[in-house]
Amino acid sequence: MAGRVGIVAVSQTKFEARKSTQHVAEMMYDVTRDVMGQTGLTFEEGTGIDCTTAAGYDLFSGPAGAYMFLGYVVGAYQRQDERVIEDGALAVYYGAMQILAGHVDVVLLVAYDKESQVPKNQIEWVCMDQVYQRRVGLDFVSAAALQAMRYTSKCGITPEQLAKVVVKCRKNAANNPNAVCCDSVTVEDVLRSPMLCDPIRVQEAKPVPVDGACAIIIASEERAKKLTNKPVWITGLGCCYDHHELGWRDLADCDALATAAQRAYKMAGIRDPMKGFDVAEISEQYAYQELLWSEGLGLCAKGEGGKLIDSGKTQMGGELPINPSGGMLSGLPVCVAGMQRVVEAALQLRGEAGPRQVAGAKRALAHGVDGPAGQLQCVVTLEN
């Protein structure tokens, strides 16, 4: 197996509710041109990028075969081309594994989504089991509501604690020029917002739609050291998925995430996650998920996500700031979010996060999720 895998360049668009003047291909072009410009890399045989890996759903982005635009816009012909029809964190996982296995040295990763093109809930409904779940109109939002109901009732999570998550994320987003929702809110504002799907309120959910893209170039240790003087090393990777049928799992637990985290931590040599990281970027489409995912990641004991947000430890300046970028609650496309978590973590470790910088950050945790009620989980650990 090869040595370490390093992140040598990252880029992201500004995320907007509707990029009406940009095609998916143009968003891909902007971020790939940026990362290739940062490194000076081309697709030259033997000295350039060996492989491209794109993450996204055609059904969410509009045009069929949207990933094929990547070849058009960057000239990636006659190279290995892979596609991940999942959250962008899976593209990072897959790309890094290709390098660790010794198959390639340099990989261009791109995640894209244009949620404004399609009615998202109808697409998610089609993704559900056609025999039982689709017949009752279940989509990802209603699946999340079932999980929120189960989790909050079992673990005693209060509406005020959920609202605190939103308040924190919006406050952090004010320092992120790429975020969609930057307006400050209070606990009372969140609790007064309309019900989206009981018990989830509108302001407790990520805004829909959101359009945008991001890109990363990763490389083997030898190549990474030549391409940048500030590589960010991927130290651990873990992935796990749970049963698609909601009734086959306890929605108040996140066993798939716990397993993915354990795999990543073992690879990275992390024994105490709360003390092992300086910053965490978690994919939370709903407020309750930041608390539940924190439990699965081992940042607090099971059932104590509410106590964690009450403690202030996850605020900027706290023991482990979670989502200094504002997270998904401040506006990210579903397919892009996991890779963008890695982008944000890399910026933190390079000291390039601007007003949202966590001082002295040396180790970071990034997390991606996909599927109904967090069916698929991916964890990436990084250090500078």
Predicted regions and their residues:
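Conserved "HGTGT" condensation-loop signature of ketosynthase/thiolase-family condensing enzymes
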Residues: M1-Q80, M97-A101, A111-P207, C214-A215, ...
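A basic- and aromatic-enriched beta-loop-alpha substructure that forms the phosphate/nucleotide-
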Residues: V84
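A short, glycine-/small-residue-rich helix N-cap motif at loop->alpha-helix starts
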Residues: D87-G88
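Active-site histidine-anchored catalytic micro-motif
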Residues: A91
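Paired acidic/hydrophobic, glycine-rich loop segments that form the ligand-binding mouth/hinge
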Residues: V106-L108
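Ligand-binding pocket segment of bilobal, Venus flytrap-like solute-binding proteins
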Residues: G212-I216, S220-E221
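Short helix-loop capping/hinge motifs at secondary-structure junctions, enriched
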Residues: R223-L227
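C-terminal membrane-solvent junction of multi-pass transporters and transport-like membrane proteins
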Residues: G331-C335
